[in-house]
Amino acid sequence: MWKKFIPYALLVPQIILGIIFIAGLATGITQSLGVIPAFGLTEPTFKYYKEILSRPDIVKSIIYSLYIAVTSATLAVLIGVGMCAVLVMNTDTKGKGMRIIQLPIIVPHVVVALFVVNILSQNGLLARLLCAMGFIKEQQDFVQLLYSTNGVGVIIAYLWKEIPFVIYFVIALMANINGSLGEAAINLGASRLIAFMKVTLPLCRRAIGSSFLIIFTFALGAYELPLLLGPTSPEALPILAHTQYIHPDLENRPYAMALNGIITIISMICAVAYFRLMQKNTEILNRRKAKKEHNEKK
């Protein structure tokens, strides 16, 4: 009898976490609309959204955050897929090489920021090496990569973390397709490159799109790297939201929640797009499975 309740018991932790998440999300949404009874704010309004979207500094922060997220996600996908292609066409998708590539995935972002500062700052290893070799006269002549408004330091840190993620996310599917349909195209006369570009890569586009959405959403809402490596102005949206949240005037809280609301809206759009990609993948797999079963019956 107890065996019937085991599946439901296993769902309890997920249900608890789901309730906490939904409660927090609902609280954030209501506060972003100006409903905080403890502060004497009881009427919902879009005033806070309108005010933050009309402030030039916040608009710059939104543009900066989108720029960091889009650039890092795009470059990570392009470089990651390119490395996947090299590994797959050389049939080197397992072994020590892949383990080394996957190592950055488990490294915390704070540690990555420390690495980047020690290597790419004007007092870092690279600046010292170039100065010692005579390429630059002084360490201060080294190009300013960190804390600049172009966000190069933040993007480099994201690339170091996210390129291995793209490889890990895509390479299994790419290797499987290239080993079956890609080889079939080669046997029919296509070159290895043409087979990859015309057969393997198009069939991986949904997995590649999914990896882009995951990286974009994470980079948009991440706090550590923009804080440690980014400029003081414009600030990334998560930093700006935290600054507003800890403001001494508690009536400033709705502004922080409105900024979080913008991040949430963009993230939800990405989540819906990701769900649609996964749904299409499932439909394709089901059709292939049904077709295979039909052929076997014949």
What are these regions (language model features)?
Residues 20-56, 133, 230-232:
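Short membrane-interfacial helix/loop motifs at transmembrane-helix boundaries
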Residues 24-34, 166-169, 207-240:
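Non-cytoplasmic
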